[in-house]
Amino acid sequence: MKFFAVLTLCIIGAIAHPLTSDEANLVKSSWNQVKHNEVDILAAVFKAYPDIQAKFPQFAGKDLDSIKTSGQFATHATRIVSFLSELIALSGNEANLSAVYGLVKKLGVDHKNRGITQGQFNEFKTALISYLSSHVSWGDNVAAAWEHALENTYTVAFEVIPA
């Protein structure tokens, strides 16, 4: 029992301010508008930040227009978007905090092992927000909900990724 209490405190400490149900609903409803645009989302990230594309050995040094129509690109884009979809589906319910924490912690460890920096995570965030703001119903409330969601996510991921 003490283990679960400690785990809960660690999670709450890492995600000190979980999304409210209203924020989670805003994130979910906006995400539902684009979650099937996997290739477009990843292409937007790579176009805005070629240094991120360079971190993917299968895409490094290749012309974005030529790779974004490949099956390999679609498969990888789907992996990324599916991960985000899973996190978003779990958001807004405090009972899911430990699951979210575990997924994001693993994301941080995996990306640290690949040499991904906090700066590149922040570039991804900027590109994702830019894509979302031009492809979904967007207002200050949606922007604030996404900022809160990504801040929570990055707080956990950055526990293992050096500054």
From Swiss-Prot:
Keywords: Heme, Iron, Metal-binding, Oxygen transport, Signal, Transport. GO terms for cellular component: extracellular region; hemoglobin complex. Heme b binds at H76, H111. Residues 18-163 form the Globin domain. It comes from the Eukaryota. SUPFAM superfamilies: Globin-like. One of its GO terms (molecular function) is heme binding. Residues 1-16 form the signal peptide. Pfam families: Globin (PF00042). InterPro entries: Erythrocruorin, Globin, Globin-like_sf, Globin/Proto, Mb-like_M. Belongs to the globin family. There are at least 12 different components in Midge globin. This is Globin CTT-V. It comes from Chironomus thummi piger (Midge). The lineage of its organism: Eukaryota, Metazoa, Ecdysozoa, Arthropoda, Hexapoda. The gene is CTT-V.
